[in-house]
Amino acid sequence: MLKSLSKLTPSIRGVVSINRSFCTKKFLPTNRSVSESDPEIYDLMMKEKQRQFTGLELIASENFTSRAVMESIGSCFTNKYAEGLPGARYYGGNEVVDQLENLCIKRALETFNLNPEEWGVNVQPYSGSTANFAAFTGLLKPHDRIMGLDLPSGGHLTHGYQTDKKKISATSIFFESMPYQVNETGYVDYNKMEANAALFRPKLLIAGASAYPREWDYERMRKIADKHGAYLLCDMAHISGMVAGKQAISPFLFCDVVTTTTHKTLRGPRAGLIFFRKTKRRDAKGNIIDDDLENRINFAVFPSCQGGPHENTIAGIAVALKEASSPDFQEYTKQVRRNSQTMGEELKKRGYSLVTEGTDNHLVLWDLRPQGITGSKIEKACDEAHITVNKNAVYGDTNAIAPGGVRLGAPALTSRGLKEQDFVKVVDFLDRVVKISLDIQSKVGKKMPDFQRAIADNQDLKQIRQEVKEFSTKFGMPGEL
């Protein structure tokens, strides 16, 4: 901070100096660090940093962002209200914010090689979930019909998830939802999707998932959507970084709208983006339709679903997008894919089963049902070893609390510099955790409370924890402040 102040003009330095003195009054915000002003929160920050540094982060939706992104999130942009769009705000004083948001829009389109005459983007959504609901709000009327991948098949809650007894997602509450599913191979069943769409006649067909390790057939989904005059939306939250790095098929070739988070494989802050096609489309009879998606999506974000955008987060998004446009980022996504495939192959070598028998992207879905243990138990046992994973449903599961699978992702550890040979070691740790867990289960039975009590004092898991710490701390922690 002091170094940056030295570069300011004399007049600005004087203002800053005055403000520093001014803020010594007790009722005003201070310039003290969090370690001085709130030791309790600072202590938690240090504990979390230690947890991330000494452990192995394998959750597919997590990543390490850069220091530049973190600095942007903590910048003075957090002070500014900016309801509306650039050039059309409901508050004054947004001349700099307008420049920021326009730059973020420009970078978002450039990162995904989009022509600004054909595509636009709203950079204001607070998260991926709000981006999705705003997109649905802009595209649909209440109780219109949607089809998305079922949650137990690897879909996301926001794609219309509901159970036999209850509508879970707001999407399923305000719209009529009929999911499509994977088949017994773990691949999306496009034939059944097409047959069900002919009966259900959706207004919106959604591609995208939170736990699907394979590429999407956007072209076929486009044809299915066109048969029923439906929009095709891709939620590329998990793979947006892979798309930017040219390691996944681009959904922009076939979709009307594309949503994403910015913090997963894209390595930005926690937020969302909505891309929309500006060009006109044709219906099944060849008639030109002007959907005006730009105004519909923008109005859905504000004022329909949100108030003022978080401009400090938008600054972080802009920084992350610049990073994602670099050759280094393309190399990163290539390494993510190699590491993910290595992880899958090493698990198979040790006799484990994978959904679809492999992966095309950043994650693998590990099926532990042949071993006779649940993903929820392995998640808890991994926690004891300081390996962070998440339980996940696999095809045929009926219990979301105790599913048969575990989702593993390579993005975070790849950001720390791990390569293929390092992921062989990671799989060794995972294999040992499973074997220890099976031994514990054989002794205490299958009830989760008994299992959790047994792993809490297990010396073998404590030994792995120490080895994990020694291994993990050999690698840096990006974004350290």
UniProtKB/Swiss-Prot annotation:
Keywords, sorted A to Z: One-carbon metabolism, Pyridoxal phosphate, Transferase
Reactions mediated catalytically: (6R)-5,10-methylene-5,6,7,8-tetrahydrofolate + glycine + H2O = (6S)-5,6,7,8-tetrahydrofolate + L-serine
GO cellular component: cytoplasm; mitochondrial matrix; mitochondrion
InterPro entries: PyrdxlP-dep_Trfase, PyrdxlP-dep_Trfase_major, PyrdxlP-dep_Trfase_small, Ser_HO-MeTrfase, Ser_HO-MeTrfase-like, Ser_HO-MeTrfase_PLP_BS, SHMT-like_dom
Enzyme Commission number(s) from the entry: 2.1.2.1
Superkingdom of source: Eukaryota
GO MF entries: glycine hydroxymethyltransferase activity; pyridoxal phosphate binding
GO biological process: glycine biosynthetic process from serine; one-carbon metabolic process; tetrahydrofolate interconversion; tetrahydrofolate metabolic process
Pathway(s) of this molecule: One-carbon metabolism; tetrahydrofolate interconversion
Pfam families, alphabetized: SHMT (PF00464)
Keyword DNA-binding belongs to the record: no
Residues with the N6-(pyridoxal phosphate)lysine modification: 264
Names of the cofactor(s): pyridoxal 5'-phosphate
Subunit structure: Homotetramer.
Function: Interconversion of serine and glycine.
HAMAP family: SHMT (MF_00051)
Similarity field: Belongs to the SHMT family.
Name this polypeptide is given: Serine hydroxymethyltransferase 2
Organism encoding this protein: Dictyostelium discoideum (Social amoeba)
